[in-house]
């Protein structure tokens, strides 16, 4: 009886997990109040930041999005990847 109960619990957890979809912030602003459901296969939240020339000075740019893989950081580009809902705030 205990084995049957344990099996049912495990199956329930696995089935519930299959329907999970990631929620990430997806915008190009410093403040990002809304989140979106990521499409299938994109279960990583990414936040990229860099400095760009704007007018007579420098401007900090930020982009948040869903991704299938974590892109590499490069010189001048900071990348933060995470795997929980809205973790790329």
From Swiss-Prot:
Expressed by the venom gland. It comes from the Eukaryota. It is found in: Secreted. Residues 1-21 form the signal peptide. Its main location: secreted. The keyword Disulfide bond applies. This is Long neurotoxin homolog TA-bm16.
């Amino acid at each position: 009886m205990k084995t049957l109960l344990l099996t049912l619990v495990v199956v329930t957890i696995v089935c519930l997990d299959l329907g999970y979809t990631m929620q990430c912030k997806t915008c190009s602003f410093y403040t990002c109040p809304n989140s979106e459901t990521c499409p299938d296969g994109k279960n990583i939240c990414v936040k990229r930041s860099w400095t760009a020339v704007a007018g007579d000075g420098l401007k900090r740019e930020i982009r948040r999005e869903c991704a299938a893989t974590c892109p590499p950081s490069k010189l001048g580009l900071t990348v933060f990847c995470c795997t929980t809902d809205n973790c790329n705030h």
